[in-house]
A protein has these predicted regions:
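Short beta-strand/loop motif that positions the catalytic acidic residue
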Residues: 147, 153-155, 159
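Catalytic nucleophile loop
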Residues: 39, 43-44
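Conserved alpha/beta-hydrolase catalytic His-Asp/Glu region
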Residues: 71-73, 89-145
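Catalytic histidine-centered segment of alpha/beta-hydrolase-like enzymes
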Residues: 186-199
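Catalytic histidine neighborhood in serine/cysteine hydrolases
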Residues: 172-189
């Protein structure tokens, strides 16, 4: 709920518990088998929490997900919500892109970016804003070491916001069955920046 044309009550809080519950319900309703959960950024946390709730998965792919819960992270997350409130996703993307994307991806985005006329604040009851605000309820103190399924960690080096190398190393080392892929020419949005390479690695 909250995505595109989905329906939800204006009074409903699209918090972490609801998002994870929706994921679990969708998987159970469709009776999906032999799945691999793939999550970008906080989506990887939601996927991991679904495993905690008993969802059966053959593996887990975490794309620029790993980070430690601290004042810096909370500051970043709350600021993103505030920016979206006053300038919408266009301002949020323009603000973030130079510090989360590779130079080549910035060049691709530039023609449609940095246009102040696109800066329109999100209404509080829109799905995207509710999801962003709900993301603030996420608990990043998850015990990653409890994950039993094989994990593939993808990290983009041009992500200067969420990529703290030492923190990622510490979390990755705590996991039981991990493979790591480093993308020196990508940032936070690996599936958008290098879609072919991303798909190839998933298929492998």
């Amino acid at each position: 709920r909250g995505q595109d044309i989905s329906k939800f009550s204006d009074k409903l809080n699209l918090d972490t518990d609801l998002i994870v519950s929706d994921l679990c319900l969708l998987i159970e309703k469709l009776k999906l088998k032999n799945i691999i959960l793939v999550g970008l950024s906080i989506g990887g946390l939601y996927a991991s929490l679904a495993l905690e709730k008993g969802i059966k998965s053959q593996g887990l792919v975490l794309i620029n997900t790993l980070r430690k819960n601290n004042t810096r992270l909370k500051w970043i997350n709350e600021t993103m919500v505030n920016v979206a409130r006053y300038g919408g996703t266009s301002l949020l993307m323009d603000m973030n892109m130079p510090v989360i994307a590779s130079p080549s991806f910035l060049d691709k985005m530039k023609p449609n970016a940095l246009n102040p006329s696109n800066y329109k604040g999100l209404e509080e009851n829109t799905g995207i804003f509710k999801l962003m605000k709900g993301s603030l309820t996420a608990n990043w103190d998850i015990d990653w070491s409890k994950i039993e399924v094989p994990v593939l960690i993808m990290t983009g080096h041009h992500d200067k916001v969420f990529r703290i190398a030492n923190d990622i190393d510490q979390i990755a080392y705590s996991m039981k069955n991990v493979q790591r892929l480093e993308f020196s020419d990508c940032g936070h949005l690996i599936p958008l920046e290098k879609p072919k390479e991303f798909a190839i690695h998933l298929n492998e």
